[in-house]
Amino acid sequence: MSDMEIRIRPVGVVRSPFKTRSDAPAQGRFSSEESEIHIFPEYLDAVDGLELFSHIFVLYWLHLAERNVLRVVPRGKRKKRGVFSTRAPARPNPVGLCLVELLECGEILRVRGLDALDGSPVIDIKPYYEDIDSLGF
């Protein structure tokens, strides 16, 4: 099974003020910066109805991340752990997930709180449903 290959085509691209990893916040929810997600023309029909939501999940490819790293020292810690137990961008399949506020909807989505670097390919977008996505903490 380890020789299985998956192909994913981006549905859009991030345009953000963050050009390098050091520019980006540790977590998007701690940022008030606005970014844009430019949806590719062939996927514009998929945006229909998204305007009904105040928040969305953005799945994106961490295109500048290292992919050969399996253990890292998490931020603020001293001991290495496996990347699956961290939020580190370096990982075998560097997929980013960020819950953002949707400010404007169209062929360009304007969002607040996205931690993706400028030029990051967007893999998917999903609406946030408070009743199923929140654990109520």
UniProtKB/Swiss-Prot annotation:
Family matches, as Gene3D superfamilies: YaeB-like
PROSITE patterns in UniProt: TSAA_1, TSAA_2
Statement: the UniProt record of this protein carries the keyword S-adenosyl-L-methionine: yes
Sorted UniProt keywords: S-adenosyl-L-methionine
Binding residues for S-adenosyl-L-methionine: 25-27, 63-64, 87, 97, 117-120
Keyword Transmembrane: no
SUPFAM superfamilies: YaeB-like (SSF118196)
A family per Pfam: TrmO_N
Positions of the TsaA-like domain: 8-137
InterPro entries (UniProt xref): TrmO-like_N, UPF0066_cons_site, YaeB-like, YaeB-like_sf, YaeB_N_sf
NCBIfam families: tRNA_TsaA
Family: Belongs to the tRNA methyltransferase O family.
PANTHER family, per the entry: TRNA (ADENINE(37)-N6)-METHYLTRANSFERASE
Protein name according to UniProt: Probable S-adenosyl-L-methionine-binding protein MTH_1797
Organism of origin: Methanothermobacter thermautotrophicus (strain ATCC 29096 / DSM 1053 / JCM 10044 / NBRC 100330 / Delta H)
Taxonomic lineage from the root: Archaea, Methanobacteriati, Methanobacteriota, Methanomada group, Methanobacteria
